[in-house]
Amino acid sequence: TFLSHDEMRQLMGSIREHFRLLPNGEYSIEVDPRKVDEATVALLGELGFNRMSLGVQDFDLAVQEAVNRVQSIEETESVLRAARANGFKSISVDLIYGLPKQNVISFNRTLEEVIRLSPDRLSIYNYAHLPSLFKPQRRIAEAELPTADAKLQILQLAIRRLTEAGYVYIGMDHFAKPDDELAVAQRQGRLHRNFQGYSTHAECDMMSFGISSISMVGPSYCQNVKTLDEYYDRLDNGVLPVMRGIELTPDDLLRRSIIQALMCHFEVSIEALEVAHLIDFKRYFAAEIADLREMEKGGLLRLDDRWISVQPRGRMLVRAIAMVFDRYLRADRERARYSKVI
């Protein structure tokens, strides 16, 4: 929504010229409520968008000032109402926990407002403070960031308040109303997760456009260059602006299926994996099983001959459980350990 109305019309016209868009498809757009008015929302509906994600982060003024993003409840509510009036069938709100000056009390007030607004979906993302990579974060005072314990308390609060309000806890960071397609897909075992979040469209190719965007086509990923100058230069020379890519190995695909199952359904059928990938699970994942046993002692999961099952206590930490099967992270840890020895 940083584009003007004319630019948005031109963009969607070009997309429709080159691609056949299904009449019953899902067409989603992420919106900054500070930059959008009712006329823009009406235009988006006219152009075919039917899903909207509203960036909120937090409604607490002190937190907003600390991250240099002041946004009133009224601005958000106005856009949300306009989306409903223009026929958007699903509206999502994005929150972030771990921001400077956040605490359980302030975030509880934000949750109360969000519950009152009653979006169809919510995402609650963990703030990653990486000032070396993101220049705007250098203005944030690290001393004002909540501790790890405080962040866990905020997440626990969010899970409790939202489930009490009738939302289904979809996974690591998503919530949805029981009749929302995400919740239905999870109940039916069709839920999928990609690098952008949860989706009802498993195994679909994803084509991305623009700087730094990531595409997923079949068993491969590729990422575009990170600067506009380089992006335009490559396009002007008839070259795809791809910076790097990877083709997944059979081992990558096996591990991806396990990570998907854990993050989407909180359980993995060992027997199904052995049949699909022709492996002996205990021998193939001996090192990983040792790590899982430690997590089992902490009550995070149950592991037997047939299933890996994430327990309620482990749902908040399902990312850490899934990371056990990421061989690239495991290799990084081994290299770090070797470096320390040297």
Where are these regions (language model features)?
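Short amphipathic alpha-helical interaction segments
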Residues: 280-296
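Solvent-exposed, charged/polar functional surfaces in cytosolic regulatory/catalytic domains
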Residues: 14, 18, 294, 324
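Minor-groove-contacting beta-hairpin "wing" of winged helix-turn-helix DNA-binding domains
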Residues: 307-311
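C-terminal scaffold of the Radical SAM
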Residues: 1-282, 336-342
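A short, conserved structural fragment
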Residues: 296-306
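Short amphipathic alpha-helical segments
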Residues: 253, 257, 268, 287-290, ...
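Short, amphipathic alpha-helical interaction segments positioned at domain boundaries
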Residues: 313-342
